[in-house]
Amino acid sequence: DYRKLFKNNRQFQFRFYFGKFLWNNKSYDNFRNYLGRSDGYLLLDEYLGRSESTGLLSQQFIMAGGGFKSIFENPKSNDLMIATNINIGLWKWFEGYLDLGILKDKDQKTRDFYGTGIKLNLLPDFFELYFPISSSNGIEIDDYRYYNKIRFVLSYEVDSLINLFSRKWF
């Protein structure tokens, strides 16, 4: 994860993820790379609704795996995943984001994914909202149930709070 804050108070953030299973096979296929929300089987992620598949708590976003904010059908791989996430400051708390990724399952064709949108960075790394605009699914904002696609970050880790208030605000 690389972040750069420019003198005009705009931020650039770049993240790259590469995951490859060397010994995963079809008979023992318990481990996978995920584009977005992981299954959190180790219980290390701070999900508010870990087992939620619908509703507000299912929309929580934690930067893990491919870091995608859009929700896709079958967004996982048992072999290879390459992903990058780019955020660019637009104006005050508004940032544009771009997610690009490639998934490859064993004995399957490669699948390409992308997602773009606007990030409302209210409290960096603590409370953020992601509004998808376009993705491999098509134009996201046209969906009549668009509110189900909005993702949020809400961190309750003490380290996040300390980092939040130790930054220069003025």
Regions found by a protein language model. Give the residues of each.
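C-terminal outer-membrane beta-barrel translocator/porin domains of Gram-negative envelope proteins
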Residues: D1-G89, D105-K106
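Transmembrane beta-strands of outer-membrane beta-barrel pores
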Residues: K4, F18-N25, L98-K106, P124-F126, ...
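Outer-membrane beta-barrel strand-turn architecture
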Residues: K4-R10, I88-F94, N121-F126, V158-I162
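Intrinsically disordered, low-complexity segments enriched in Gly and acidic/Ser/Thr residues
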Residues: I88-G96, L103-T110
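Outer-membrane beta-barrel "beta-signal"
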Residues: L120-F126, Y146-F170
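Transmembrane beta-strands of outer-membrane beta-barrel proteins
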Residues: F12-F16, F94-L98, I118, F127-L129, ...
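Residues that define the transmembrane beta-barrel architecture of outer-membrane proteins
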Residues: R10, K76-I82, T110-T116, N121-L123, ...
